Amino acid sequence: MENMKVLLGLICLMVPLLSLEIDVCTEYPNQIVLFLSVNEIDIRKCPLTPNKMHGDTIIWYKNDSKTPISADRDSRIHQQNEHLWFVPAKVEDSGYYYCIVRNSTYCLKTKVTVTVLENDPGLCYSTQATFPQRLHIAGDGSLVCPYVSYFKDENNELPEVQWYKNCKPLLLDNVSFFGVKDKLLVRNVAEEHRGDYICRMSYTFRGKQYPVTRVIQFITIDENKRDRPVILSPRNETIEADPGSMIQLICNVTGQFSDLVYWKWNGSEIEWNDPFLAEDYQFVEHPSTKRKYTLITTLNISEVKSQFYRYPFICVVKNTNIFESAHVQLIYPVPDFKNYLIGGFIILTATIVCCVCIYKVFKVDIVLWYRDSCSGFLPSKASDGKTYDAYILYPKTLGEGSFSDLDTFVFKLLPEVLEGQFGYKLFIYGRDDYVGEDTIEVTNENVKKSRRLIIILVRDMGGFSWLGQSSEEQIAIYNALIQEGIKIVLLELEKIQDYEKMPDSIQFIKQKHGVICWSGDFQERPQSAKTRFWKNLRYQMPAQRRSPLSKHRLLTLDPVRDTKEKLPAATHLPLG
């Protein structure tokens, strides 16, 4: 049992590793370089933004290793959530790292080059690891200590920040310099304010303190007349948001570097310790001019609360002379009935198509089942004046012993099933006519009394000369097609390849209604009505409401009806 647990554990560990090798990730061609200071703790975020609503996960790898960086916090280099931790950074940590974002449908990765730097000789920092920031002369602005928001404690507070200039402590006199959290406010910027500013703090991790240092290259730029900032987004708009969802609102401004861009809600600025709202700042210098920047302040809403629908979120940009604003109003999502309608229409269409296909394939079985199951519940039909359900028209034998299979089918098998098992009433010439009756009168009278005309076809009947040339056939087909409008059913006892030799009327009937082919034998034994031939024939017959005469009635080839003498089944009156 213990060995089985070990084996299952190994399988669970191997499956994710194998899947990592199999997956092919799309790589973003970003040229991202991170400079870290040796022997300092550092935390860096993946440049790719995961979508937690889609189940995105982030995994870090070093170099080309297929093994993810450990999530064990005792490891000097480890991953916590989507962040990569160096506790502390060493020179040998330099190299490139892959950040991979994946879910069940896609995989993205980006390459991050990490360089761990030692301090330059005679300095308390490395000049390669500086972050340039610019302020206008004679204006007010602020220097922001970059990439330190990850060091907030459980109360969402940063450690105390100490400021230095050119490695010497900076005097915060509250006249020219003000220290506010991770920002250094500079009043009335002057040329002599140029230099390298260091923001330093101590961060405690697992009971041990580590230094955190950032170097800002403060560059002064000439005084210039301020241009009015332009808010590109939002534009006084509304956004649908689901309650409890996580969304981002972006304030995109084109203006000066010193323009302040921030969000307000319900008349107040966003508090730094708000449990649901957090701001993130970005700026990008315009390539066309060094005096204009794209300033982006992102408001991250971790959970949309009901009160957020009451008041708009206001994007504010201001400088010493100008104040601009635009708002975003959150609204509840409007139900999208379009998708439901499309889905319902597709389902309905698919259902109809399936039903039509099923009906076409099983049409005969469905109709017969309906007749057998529901005929007793339907109201009785008014009499149509017909006596017979079908008149059987077949080639007459030329002498005794000829066409014995045909006679067996006509006088034995056909009545046995249709009359004996299903109660149909057939008129068969040679069985139901009386001695001495005129053929023309018998045919004319009984075709009119029949609901169907069943024509039986066989091969080798002298080019089918019997069809349409004798008086009986002519009268029967004429009455069925022209005078009475009776439905005609063609039965092939043998496969007939060439219908061109047949009369046009037969060709027309075959083309319009098709033909039913016999597939059984001619043994004189009880027939099963469940074969395809008998089902197709019953389908062409009228709906039967009478009970069958006998489900196992066997007919002889010389039937006697009532007390009158009938003609022998194998001998018939000559036609015409």
Curated annotation (Swiss-Prot):
Tissues of expression: Isoform 2 is expressed in various brain tissues.
Span of domain Ig-like C2-type: 25-115, 121-213, 229-329
Name assigned to this protein: Interleukin-1 receptor type 1
Bilayer topology annotation: Single-pass type I membrane protein
Stated consequence of mutating residue 134 to E: Results in impaired interaction with IL1RN
Any one Gene Ontology molecular-function term assigned to this protein's record: interleukin-1 receptor activity
Pfam families in UniProt: I-set, Ig_2, TIR
Ranges per topology, Cytoplasmic: 360-576
Stretches assigned to the Extracellular side: 20-338
Reactions that this protein is recorded to catalyse: NAD(+) + H2O = ADP-D-ribose + nicotinamide + H(+)
Enzyme class at the top of the EC tree: hydrolase
